[in-house]
Swiss-Prot record:
Residues 193-284 are annotated as: Coil 1B. Residues 1-137 are annotated as: Head. Transmembrane segments: none annotated. Residues 138-450 form the IF rod domain. Residues 447-609 are annotated as: Tail. Expressed in the perinuclear ring of spermatid manchettes within testis and in keratinocytes of the suprabasal layer of footpad epidermis (at protein level). There are two types of cytoskeletal and microfibrillar keratin, I (acidic) and II (neutral to basic) (40-55 and 56-70 kDa, respectively). It comes from Rattus norvegicus (Rat). This is Keratin, type I cytoskeletal 9. The gene is Krt9. Residues 1-49, 449-618 are annotated as: Disordered.
Amino acid sequence: MSFRQISSSFRSSSGSSCGGGGGRGASRGSMRSSFGRSSRAGGESRFGSSSGFGGGGFSACGTGGGGSFGSSYGGGYGRGFSAGSSSGMFGGSSRGCFGGGSGGGFGGGSGGGFGGGFGGGFGGGSGGGEGSILNTNEKVVMQNLNSRLASYMDKVQELEEDNANLEKQIQEWYSRKGNRVFQKDYSHYYNTIEDLKDRIVDLTARNNKALIDMDNTRMTLGDFRVKLEMEQSLPQGVDADINGLQKVLDDINMEKSDLEIQFDSLDDELKALKKSHKEEMNQLTGLNDGDVNVEINVAPSTDLTQVLNDMREEYEHLISKNRQDIEQHYESQMTQIEHQLTNSGPEMETNMKQVSQLQHSVQELNIELQTQLTTKSALEKALEDTKNRYCGQLQQIREQISEMEAQLAQVRAETECQNQEYGLLLSIKTRLEKEIETYRKLLEGGQQDFESSGAGQIGFGSGKGGQRGSGGSYGGGSGDSYEGESGGSYGGGSGGSHGGKSGGSYGGGSSSGGGSGGSYGGGSGGSHGGKSGGSHGGGSGGSYGGGSGSGGESGGSYGGGSGGSHGGQKGGSGGSYEGGSGGSYGGGSGSGGGSGGSYGGGNTRPSQSQSSQIPRLR
């Protein structure tokens, strides 16, 4: 037998949906593991089934044929070594996971159990330990692996020798070509390089000198600018001095006009005195022209002419004296003013410099004030924009909060509804547990009847003859993924995938949230509303409303067809004691009425022998 591949990979979805036999994958992620080629039909392939949720089964009805070595999560049946028997994968149903029960586990077959053989189970079977065929197959696998490892090592050694030969050839080629390698003479470029370096140094020095000259010129320009500002400030100082002297000149002109007015008034007064004196003289002269001569002996009179002349001289002397005093006062005042102007020149220059500096300071402060005002306006605008933006964001956050509060209220309402539904389901679960207990008691009594009547070995592994029971023994496998609960009775493996409840009867496994099975071999389907089977061999109804029968075929999952997959294939549960159940995401296929496992049972075929049914309890 040749092995084509050894691969193991996990895929999120592979193959068709939770279907029946033949190695089709499921849609909830699968582990594909195959040693060799898979086969859907019967035959002699012992390392054959591909796996996945809905793992492969070999659905031939004939006798003989090898058991499946590869398995699935919830694996299927392969064909046994004798009629109706099937071999388990990795130690039978007691190692099952992701849906034990009848046919569950990593290929948990009808020969399951650590001590089960062909037909091992509740009623015992014929011989066989856990892995007689597995040991043989492991030897073959190890021999194949050893041969492949030896060929791989030979290939590696051959490649290393080829690599050494290539390295040797490369070294020989370099040794032959090494003498022909010559170096070019670049000495005639050295002078050119030196000339270029000298030119670079010269240009660098010139550039630095030009930079220094530019700096000096810039400093000289700054000095001339300062001198220009000083020269521009000097005419301003001279203009201020001229304005001050103009005021002094105006004051002097005012005093001169006052003196002229006084001079005019005194001149008019003098003229008036002369006129009055002349009139008096004329009057006196007229008196002297009369005929009367009066002689009076008096003292000699004063000469009026002389008196007037004296007075005239006195006034003229007074006027000249006043004029000289005024001129001297004017000259002294002008001298003092000129002296003051001469002394206040440096002080005026200092004051003008201070004034110019203060003007510059005022200009700088005005510029800074404008800058601060511009910055203030920009900051106010930015503040307004920020307020508007954050107000918008705050409004959005408030709207989101209101939406979240509405969603929270909705979630709370849904939670209340779910709590009510949970209470209802809990009451249903309690009622179903009571029914399961009743079924268990009935089944125990029926089993005692079978043992006493010698009806044959009732194995949930492979029975002989017409007893094609589903997998499972005293130690029926437990599947415990996705909240599955534990199995119940003698070998009743717990399916328990996706919230499955506990299995009930001799091998009845549950899957996908289904209710409990109720017959000797009837596994429970029953996810999402599936009804439980109630007879000796009646298969349970599948998921999503599969119907139940008393010996007929069970409805499949997802709208149940007659098989186990999505509306799946044909084989439902038979009507015999060992009739396997359809049900969960497609049961694995057995050779004759094997039960569909969890997550991967295929279709089953009806068994050949049937017995009476036990009435279903409500």
